Amino acid sequence: MSARPGSSTRQLTESVDIFPTLAELAGLPAPKGPQPINGISMVPVLKDPGARVRDHAFHAYPRGKLGRAIRTERYRLVEWRRPGEPEKNAQYELYDYHVDPLERENLAAKNPGVMKKLKATLASYPAPFSRA
């Protein structure tokens, strides 16, 4: 490793990145299995805190409805809907961390361009399963 102790980074990461990162640090081959490994090794960021390996992070959170979110350095888009429910019934939250780091003002209705871009990124992730 070449990053100085105490270094910080602005690189977004997710808990699914831990496994591929540890595997690479241990010198093991890239993890493979019957289910896809969604994480990305963060070793490049450990070596150079300025390195970038992705431009967003994805997470999902159940709270009555399923909240699926895309987080970029600037924005967080959250989509709330029940599994199997059509997208037209979804509720959205959009926050701009440059001016509202505490997520107090939902900008979803005010930023259609940002919404369109982040919704397209969100659509690249598997839709939640529907309950029969």
Regions found by a protein language model. Give the residues of each.
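Active-site-proximal N-terminal segment of extracellular/periplasmic enzymes that hydrolyze or transfer
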Residues: 105-113
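Acidic/proline-rich low-complexity IDRs
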Residues: 24-27, 106, 117
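C-terminal cap/loop subdomain of S1 sulfatases and analogous C-terminal strand-loop tails that border
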Residues: 3-4, 11, 16-19, 23-97, ...
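Second-shell loop/turn segments in exported
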Residues: 6-8, 106
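Intrinsically disordered, low-complexity polar regions and short flexible loop motifs
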Residues: 100
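Hydrophobic packing residues in well-ordered alpha-helices of helical domains and bundles
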Residues: 70, 115-118
